[in-house]
């Protein structure tokens, strides 16, 4: 029993020694790691000795000192500034339009700006040009003689010939009633005047025109128009319109007549033909045509009537009137 008590006492002492040793070791390690090192650092640099990265030129104090020195210099030398300004003004030269350099040099110099007297403003070249353009300009209209028509020219030639012959007859050089050459010359001049007078109406009526229009409030569908034209022998070609050739199916043969859209710009865009619609078509034939004009005109009239019947429209003449029998006879009379 005494041994057991002694053993417990020794074990307790051993445990107490181990705990004390561990606490002492931990305190020693902590003091070694977290030791106070502030005493070993050098003393801090005073604030007044801090080095600045700002250059001296940007220092407000130095700038104010520099400005003060410059102001003192400017105040101390007003006469020198006056002389420099006057010399700069003398070197300025402004040349106006219409003035040469010699005339400008002879002019007296302008009074300097700083002399205390008002100076007249100098008018530059652009100001002078703007003032000239702003003034109202009165332009007299130029009347040019209009070119005379062929009939008037032929009449004037005939009158001049008659006047010349009358003058010669008055002088006794020629007899205008008995001389055969004079009668031949007068006849030639008269024939020339008549031929020129007959050429003008022919030139004006060199094309026959017919219209196929839809009923009021309706329009022709684009795909149906193309289908009807191709069924009548038309071929899509030059100028984006349809043409009727002399030989059906042969686009290399001459064109007899053509058909275009009645609405501007008058073409058929096949890429958008599904969304295309128009109120009318115009058929036209140039005179003279390839082959017989009468035969071609009859073919044009027949084709126009068939197209109007296929589309459900009406045929109009060149005056936008209903095409009737009188219009047919008038068209045939123009080519007969």
From Swiss-Prot:
Transmembrane spans: 3-23
Topology within the bilayer: Single-pass type I membrane protein
Predominant place of localization: membrane
Periplasmic side: 1-2
GO cellular component assignments: cell division site; plasma membrane
UniProt-annotated location(s): Cell inner membrane
Pfam families the record matches: ZipA_C (PF04354)
InterPro entries, per the entry: Cell_div_ZipA, ZipA_FtsZ-bd_C, ZipA_FtsZ-bd_C_sf
Gene Ontology biological-process annotations: division septum assembly; FtsZ-dependent cytokinesis
Keyword vocabulary terms for this entry: Cell cycle, Cell division, Cell inner membrane, Cell membrane, Membrane, Transmembrane, Transmembrane helix
SUBUNIT field: Interacts with FtsZ via their C-terminal domains.
Name of this chain's protein: Cell division protein ZipA
Organism: Actinobacillus pleuropneumoniae serotype 5b (strain L20)
């Amino acid at each position: 029993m005494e041994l057991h008590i002694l053993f417990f006492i020794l074990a307790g002492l051993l445990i107490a020694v181990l705990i004390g040793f561990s606490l002492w070791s931990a305190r020693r390690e902590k003091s070694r790691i977290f030791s106070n090192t502030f005493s070993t650092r050098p003393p801090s640099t005073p604030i007044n000795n801090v080095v600045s990265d700002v250059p001296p030129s940007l220092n407000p104090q130095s700038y104010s000192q520099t400005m003060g020195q410059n102001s003192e210099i400017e105040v101390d030398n007003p006469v020198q500034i006056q002389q420099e300004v006057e010399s700069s003004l003398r070197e300025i030269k402004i040349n106006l339009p219409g003035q040469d350099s010699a005339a400008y040099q002879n002019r007296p110099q302008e009074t300097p700006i700083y002399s205390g007297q008002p100076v007249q403003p100098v008018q530059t070249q652009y100001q002078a040009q703007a003032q000239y353009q702003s003034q109202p300009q009165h332009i007299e209209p130029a009347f040019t003689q209009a070119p005379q028509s062929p009939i008037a020219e032929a009449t004037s030639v005939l009158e001049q010939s008659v006047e010349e012959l009358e003058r010669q007859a008055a002088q006794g050089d020629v007899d205008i009633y008995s001389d055969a050459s004079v009668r031949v010359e007068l006849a030639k001049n008269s024939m020339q005047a008549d031929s020129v007078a007959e050429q003008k109406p022919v030139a004006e009526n060199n094309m026959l025109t017919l219209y196929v229009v839809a009923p009021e409030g309706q329009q022709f569908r684009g795909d149906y128009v193309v289908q009807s034209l191709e069924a009548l022998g038309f071929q899509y070609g030059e100028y984006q319109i349809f043409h009727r050739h002399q030989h059906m199916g042969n686009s290399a043969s001459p064109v007899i007549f053509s058909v275009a859209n009645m609405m501007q710009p008058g073409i058929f865009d096949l890429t958008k033909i599904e969304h295309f619609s128009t109120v009318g078509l115009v058929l036209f034939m140039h005179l003279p045509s390839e082959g017989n004009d009468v035969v071609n005109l009859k073919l044009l009239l027949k084709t126009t009537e068939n197209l109007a019947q296929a589309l459900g429209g009406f045929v109009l003449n060149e005056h936008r009137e209903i095409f009737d029998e009188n219009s047919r006879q008038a068209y045939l009379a123009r080519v007969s």
